[in-house]
């Protein structure tokens, strides 16, 4: 059925609903299969109308269509069966078993037998799994929750759960428009025509009473243009008997998929590549939030898109991690925590902010560009301005004569746009005069000149970063009506796109279906789309307002929005239907005459924000009505600039008095409070050591390989690192003489290593268990932080859960409250498939993001366990080879990287039970795997002391290197090499018995190392704290050392006597460390005797000592000690 015919069905459905033909409405829904009315379905389930439930479902899916459908029908029929048993209607139960449930026996015979055995019980609740079954009403409600999840995940229901957003009585409106048009064609139109029928075209009667000719032979109608010549009615094209010419890009483009891809723009990848790359945006399956139970006139978004999954593996195990939650767009009862009502910071920039952008990884770093050409870098957590640079041309001799003349005539320059690169190692500034300047960022206040490009004649109106052909590029547009693409390392120009007839105002690069493209808007309101070739524009559409318009995608890359203001001050915020190049939704609530160009931003795939009428206005993406307004305690300009940080916890807003207000939601407030505490600790430490405030040198090494410049562009030499004094003054180190050596130190204030030697100096808790436990091989906190999971060397899993009570209101893990060793009522243990000698097997596991499942192995098959029931869901991959390490892909939990004992890494797709790739590069077993979702790489480590970096796009090996291991040190015990990514996703931790090191991923070079002294105890394990500020390391002598992660200097040492009982054997030591996912100063240890301990600092201390002072007063570059050397603070152990 054509798209227009489908839309006609929706119009009829709306009409029937308005006319109260309720049964007919649902019959048409079922027969057409276009719209699944979740509200109706819910009502029928709650009322137990099982025949109607299955009849209605039958219009959309059948039992054997896919595994989702099978599970839906199974749950319904199982509930019907249980209700018959509950009523002691055995004959009805047998009938249901034979007619309805037997079809599932071929798929799971054991389950069918178990269901059949319920007939033998007097009360089916005697079955352990059904012991908590309540009354019929509550059981139906619980089942309904599961059914809704299955329906939302089922691809057959995609695009069928959301009713289009139609104005009321849309069909009547279209008929009236048609009648009006017909009336205009009458030869003798009457002032008040009498419409008696819709069965034939309207025509006013002849004055002499003669009959009007029929439409078929009416010469007037034959001579008028076809409907295609008339303006479209509403947002849809008119009904046409013949197909209209397809635009060059087939609408906008075609077939974007439903799964998000970790590309520059957060765009989407799919299951295949379209045959026509120029057709990438047509018929999108947009994974937006949706309301499954709304009435007809109000629904308007495409539905959440999810992958299929095998029966028995419900929830999130094999669903994409970035799947969106279902929300209810018609309900405005959002938690107040969602909104940025709190003014958390007020920053004084000194000139009017024109553009702002938060760092993509460090959530509190804010770039600001102003109307006088200044650029500033703020840490809004500490309220400190790290950098202030005034505009100047780096090399005037390399600039065009036009620019030189322009600057001589009028030296004033404004920043039009400032923006970070996707990984935060570069940022670009577009100025109102010809120039684009690119800086590299090395952490803290260290920014360096990278590229200066004389990009456009006139102003450079916008700048963006993109990754065409896996190469970082810079995209600019300007007053000269062109868009240009530059290579980000050398500044070489790659493309110039011409075709606009007015200055180009903005660019919006995006990625879909392996196709990179760019949207551009010009001051005449034209929107064009470009591929990275020389074939010209693929799209030519008009933006609402026909003037200054910017475009942006939602964070997941699935929905396209634009915001523009006309010359008359009329503002338009709209969502686009990419398949048709038409406006899908227009948001209401703007002032009729905006006093400036309205700016906007999106956050969390859920909200839109725009600055208008001295306010910040907020919309739900799925509702055109204004959701709320925020005045930020006043002081805002008429059209304030707005910018969210990546996580959506902070919102930067420009103020009237050359300042910026930082608004925070509840999560943002907590983030800033955490940083305030850390800032206070750091400043106290700084005053005690008489040194300047520390910056994070780990992040300083985050710059990508982008330091060289090519001919034709100006690439500035690295400037001396800047420091920021406490008064915010930004100066070069050249201008500041070090005073530390000249000032006498107060010895009582010199920094001192924190040593914990007895139990009274910290909080420690041994987790009790009632079974004889073997060595703890693996240990992890659940992602929620409320439990600890351990895997012992006897292949048994242990799960401790903390209670929520008066002593522990959060319910999270703590050393102050004892948890319970949790077991299901059945007494079943999660036990891995084992070999003949499990004690010598390699044990490994990986936990799903929602803590519902654990994938685990102990030398035998890999097992998938349900964490709620401890039930084994499936087993796969029998040895040999045996799995030695497991890691879920960060974008798709269907994909698992499995390290093997034969030195290979297998990329396994759970959903289709297939090995997609086999990576070869190591010579011994794999001992560590870690993904970076920023760099799109997998880092592996092996027993061969080799580290490899693999691209997750094509699974090619990018780099490899051997660890630097002192040749003079024999290996005392065989220990793994482990890897773990830093929070910035750019660096990773390497742990070996001889050393701890931090590597920069793209260059695969160590930026910091801490080698173990000769004849000292080897390292057994180490791990970052949840905020990557600390590293917890355990040693063979049971000592635990806590390092400052930015400097790899020892900050605290915990001796065994402080947490182990006195009578314990000297052979007992920690073999694994786990860090709490949200409490940075809490960690757990798994010991050789099977003990698990949780450690925290005293409540009076709150932390494990103070950070050590920076070496030699330096705060920037990370140094690497020579091979085998010891750091200056190396303790005697």
Swiss-Prot record:
Expressed in panicles, stems, leaves, spikelets and seed endosperm. WD repeats lie at residues 348-388, 410-449, 455-496, 499-540, 543-586, 590-629, 634-673, 771-810, 837-875, 878-918, 921-960, 1014-1053. It comes from the Eukaryota. InterPro entries: CTLH_C, LisH, Quinoprotein_ADH-like_sf, Topless_fam, Topless_Znf, TPL_SMU1_LisH-like, TPR1-like_2nd, WD40/YVTN_repeat-like_dom_sf. Pfam families: LisH_TPL (PF17814), TPR1-like_2nd (PF21889), WD40 (PF00400), zf_topless (PF21359). This is Protein TPR3. Tetramer. Interacts with D53. Interacts with MODD and HDAC1. Interacts with WOX1. Interacts with MOF1. One of its GO terms (biological process) is regulation of DNA-templated transcription. Probable downstream regulator of strigolactones signaling. Functions in a complex with MODD and HDAC1 to down-regulate the histone acetylation level at BZIP46 target genes. BZIP46 is a positive regulator of abscisic acid (ABA) signaling and drought stress tolerance. The gene is TPR3. Residues 1112-1133 have a biased composition (Polar residues). Gene3D superfamilies: YVTN repeat-like/Quinoprotein amine dehydrogenase. It comes from Oryza sativa subsp. japonica. Residues 287-307, 1099-1133 are annotated as: Disordered. Keywords: Repeat, WD repeat.
């Amino acid at each position: 059925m054509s798209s227009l015919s489908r839309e006609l069905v929706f119009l009829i459905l709306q009409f029937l609903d308005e006319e109260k033909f309720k049964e007919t409405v649902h019959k048409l829904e079922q027969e057409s299969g276009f719209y699944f009315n979740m509200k109706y379905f819910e009502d029928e389930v709650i009322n137990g109308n099982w025949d109607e439930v299955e009849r209605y479902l039958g219009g959309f899916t059948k039992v054997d269509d896919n595994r989702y459908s099978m599970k839906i029908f199974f749950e319904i029929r199982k509930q019907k069966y249980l209700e018959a048993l509950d009523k002691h209607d055995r004959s009805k139960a047998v009938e249901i078993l034979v007619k309805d449930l037997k079809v599932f026996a071929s798929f799971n015979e054991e389950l069918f037998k178990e269901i059949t055995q319920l007939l033998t019980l007097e009360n089916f609740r005697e079955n352990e799994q059904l012991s908590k079954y309540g009354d019929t009403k509550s059981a139906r409600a619980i089942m309904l929750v599961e059914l809704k999840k299955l329906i939302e995940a089922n691809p057959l229901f995609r695009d069928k759960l959301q009713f289009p957003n139609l104005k009321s009585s849309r069909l009547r409106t279209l008929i009236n428009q048609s009648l009006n048009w017909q009336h205009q064609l009458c030869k003798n139109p009457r002032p008040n025509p009498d419409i008696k029928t819709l069965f034939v075209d309207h025509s006013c009667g002849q004055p002499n009473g003669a009959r009007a000719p029929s439409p078929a032979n009416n010469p007037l109608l034959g001579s008028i243009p076809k409907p295609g010549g008339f303006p479209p009615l509403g947002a849809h094209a008119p009904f046409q008997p013949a197909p209209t010419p397809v635009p060059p890009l087939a609408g906008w483009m075609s077939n974007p998929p439903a799964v998000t891809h970790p590309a520059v723009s957060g765009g989407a990848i799919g299951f295949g590549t379209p045959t026509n790359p120029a057709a990438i945006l047509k018929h999108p399956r947009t994974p937006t939030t949706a309301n499954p139970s709304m009435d007809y006139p109000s629904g308007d978004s495409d539905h959440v898109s999810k992958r299929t999954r095998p029966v028995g593996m419900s929830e999130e195990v094999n669903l994409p991690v970035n799947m969106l939650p279902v929300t209810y767009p018609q309900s405005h009862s959002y938690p107040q925590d969602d909104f940025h009502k709190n003014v958390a910071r007020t920053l004084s920039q000194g000139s009017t902010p024109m553009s702002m952008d938060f760092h993509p990884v460090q959530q509190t770093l804010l770039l600001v560009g102003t109307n006088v050409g200044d650029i500033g870098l703020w840490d809004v957590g500490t309220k400190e301005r790290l950098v202030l640079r005034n505009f100047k041309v780096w090399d005037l001799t390399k600039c065009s004569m036009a620019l030189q003349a322009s600057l001589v005539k009028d030296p004033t320059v404004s920043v039009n746009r400032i923006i970070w690169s996707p990984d935060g190692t570069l940022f670009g500034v577009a100025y109102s005069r010809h120039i684009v300047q690119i800086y590299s960022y090395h952490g803290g206040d260290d920014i360096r000149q990278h590229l200066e490009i004389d990009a456009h004649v006139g102003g450079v109106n916008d700048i963006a970063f993109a990754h065409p052909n896996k190469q970082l590029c810079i995209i600019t547009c300007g007053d000269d009506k062109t868009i240009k693409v530059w290579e980000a390392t050398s500044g070489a120009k790659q493309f110039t796109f011409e075709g606009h007839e007015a200055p180009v105002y903005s660019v919006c690069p995006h990625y879909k279906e392996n196709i990179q493209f760019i949207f551009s808007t010009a001051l005449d309101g034209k929107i064009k789309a470009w591929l990275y070739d020389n074939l010209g524009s693929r799209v030519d559409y008009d933006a609402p307002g026909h003037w200054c318009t910017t475009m942006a995608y939602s964070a997941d890359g699935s929905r396209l929005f634009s915001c523009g203001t006309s010359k008359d001050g009329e503002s338009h915020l709209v969502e686009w239907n990419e398949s048709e190049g038409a406006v899908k939704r227009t948001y209401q609530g703007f002032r009729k005459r905006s006093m400036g160009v309205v700016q906007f931003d999106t956050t969390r795939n859920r909200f839109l924000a725009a600055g208008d009428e001295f306010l910040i206005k907020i919309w739900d993406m799925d509702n055109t009505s204004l959701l709320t307004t925020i005045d930020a305690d006043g002081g805002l300009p008429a059209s304030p600039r707005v910018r969210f940080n990546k996580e959506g916890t902070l919102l930067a807003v420009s103020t009237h008095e050359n300042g910026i207000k930082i608004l925070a939601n509840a999560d943002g407030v907590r983030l800033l409070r955490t940083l305030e505490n850390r800032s206070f600790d750091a400043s106290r430490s700084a005053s005690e050591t008489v040194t300047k405030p520390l910056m994070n040198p780990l992040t300083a090494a985050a710059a990508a390989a982008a330091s060289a410049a090519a001919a034709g562009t100006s690439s500035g030499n690295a400037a001396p690192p800047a420091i920021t004094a406490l008064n915010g003054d930004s100066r070069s180190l050249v201008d500041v003489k070090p005073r530390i050596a000249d000032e006498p130190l107060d010895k009582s204030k010199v920094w001192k290593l924190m040593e914990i030697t007895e139990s009274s100096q910290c909080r420690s808790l041994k987790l009790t268990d009632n079974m004889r436990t073997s060595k703890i091989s693996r240990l992890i906190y659940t992602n929620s932080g409320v439990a600890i999971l351990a895997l012992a060397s006897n292949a048994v899993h242990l799960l401790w859960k903390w209670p929520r009570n008066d002593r522990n209101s959060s319910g999270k893990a703590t050393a102050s409250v004892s948890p319970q060793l949790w077991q299901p009522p059945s007494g079943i243990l999660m036990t891995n498939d084992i070999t003949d000698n499990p004690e010598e097997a390699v044990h490994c596991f990986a936990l799903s993001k929602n803590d519902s499942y654990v994938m685990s192995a102990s030398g035998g098959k890999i097992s998938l366990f349900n964490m709620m029931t401890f039930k084994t869901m499936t087993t796969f991959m029998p040895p040999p080879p045996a799995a030695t390490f497991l890691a879920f892909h960060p974008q798709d939990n269907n994909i698992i990287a499995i390290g093997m004992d034969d030195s290979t890494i297998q990329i396994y797709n759970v959903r289709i039970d297939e090995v997609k790739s086999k990576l070869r590069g190591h010579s011994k077993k794999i001992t560590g795997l870690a993904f970076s979702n920023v760099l799109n790489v997998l880092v592996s480590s092996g027993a061969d002391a080799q580290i490899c970096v693999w691209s997750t796009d094509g699974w090619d090996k990018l780099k490899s290197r051997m660890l630097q291991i002192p040749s003079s040190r024999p290996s005392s015990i065989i220990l793994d090499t482990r890897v773990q990514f830093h929070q910035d996703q750019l660096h990773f931790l390497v742990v070996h018995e001889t050393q701890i090191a931090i590597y920069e991923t793209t260059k695969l070079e160590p930026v910091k190392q801490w080698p173990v002294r000769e004849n000292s105890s080897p390292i057994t394990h180490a791990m970052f704290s949840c905020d990557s500020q600390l590293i917890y390391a355990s040693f063979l002598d049971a000592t635990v050392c806590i390092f400052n992660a930015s400097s790899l200097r020892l900050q605290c040492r915990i001796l065994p006597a402080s947490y182990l009982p006195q009578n314990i054997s000297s052979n007992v030591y920690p073999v694994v460390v786990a860090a709490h996912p949200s409490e940075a100063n809490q960690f757990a240890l798994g010991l050789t005797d099977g003990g698990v301990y949780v450690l925290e600092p005293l409540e009076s201390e709150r932390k494990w000592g103070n950070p050590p002072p920076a070496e030699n007063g330096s705060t920037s570059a990370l140094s690497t000690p020579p091979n085998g050397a010891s750091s200056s603070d190396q303790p005697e152990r």
